[in-house]
Amino acid sequence: MTIREAVLDEKTLAVLIGFSEDWAAENSCFGYRPNEKSDIEGNRIFLAEEDGGAVGYLFGKVYPSKQMQSIMPEGTPYFEVEELYVVPERRSRGIGMKLFRYAEEAVKAEAEYMVLSTATKNWKAIFHFYLDELDMTFWSARLFRKIEK
């Protein structure tokens, strides 16, 4: 398996759009919809490839922090992971971790933190991945409950 930073050409765009359509069909995240080109443009893109084809991706970009003083000083540059996806048949094999670590190494000259939000329905698995395997720190949670009528 190889991880590489990719440019957003037509081939890469087609791969990312296809993966996001598959992800939306899984119905594993609240509110997730397939990406359009405008959702991806301007992001740094990292691809995981095996056997000549893509099996996962991570994309995001660097921002200056705003209203995040509880974890970093105002204006601190951080890399916001917008999406991290691995095809279902290749999950739990370390690909997501390798994508994350590769991106972290690639952006460390311009960012001081890696930050992400998740809307997954399987929060136990995602917390295990991000907190236990990637050694991230829990920052906040937004929970909901439908009011029964």
What is each model feature region?
Residues 72-88, 141:
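Conserved acetyl-CoA binding element of GNAT-fold acetyltransferases
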Residues 21-49:
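Active-site rim helix/loop that mediates acceptor-substrate recognition in acyltransferases
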Residues 107-119:
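Conserved GNAT acetyl-CoA-binding A-motif
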Residues 97, 120-140:
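Conserved active-site alpha-helix within GNAT-family acetyltransferase domains
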Residues 1-16:
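A short beta-loop-alpha structural element at the N-terminal edge
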Residues 59-79:
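Conserved acyl-donor/pantetheine-binding loop and adjacent beta-alpha core of acyl/acetyltransferases
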Residues 86, 92-105:
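Conserved acetyl-CoA-binding loop-helix of GNAT-fold acetyltransferases
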Residues 47, 53-62, 80, 85:
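Conserved beta-strand in the GNAT
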